[in-house]
Amino acid sequence: MSHYLGIDIGTSGTKTLLIQADGKIVAEATAEYPLAQPRPGWTEQDPELWWNATVKTVNEVMASSKVKPADVKAIGLSGQMHGSVFVDKQGNVIRPALLWNDQRTAAECDEITSAAGGRKALIKMVANPALTGFQAPK
């Protein structure tokens, strides 16, 4: 029988589901992790937490279901919105990730908006305003 793995790497934890082709849930597992707030309005996480939680929940789901890995026909993955993971030339993470809800880039948003000729001009150019949660200001 075909099975499908769904992995949601969220802000507070990772949830993994194993389902059958008809949508019936066969197994599920969740692993939570902390959110660092080093200053008011700042939110960060170590991306290693996401990886460890993903490995843990996939292993738990596969072990509890006794489904063979070869029977998993596809993997669906969703992750946090607009987080920035900064890496060096070798691909190593160099600092905690700035999350989608991090608000430290208000000054950068103002600078981008001004450089574009104002809010309306920026929206006309890229179809969005500069917001603290988006990638460009980070």
Model-assigned labels for residue ranges:
Residues S2-D8, D71-G76:
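Short glycine-aspartate micro-motif
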Residues L5, A27, K68:
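Conserved Rossmann-like nucleotide-binding pocket used by diverse enzymes
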Residues I9-W50, N92-L99:
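Short glycine-rich, Thr/Ser-proximal phosphate-binding strand/loop in the N-terminal lobe
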Residues K56-K138:
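Glycine-rich phosphate-binding/catalytic subdomain of phosphoryl-transfer
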Residues Y4, T16-L17, S84:
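Generic short beta-strand
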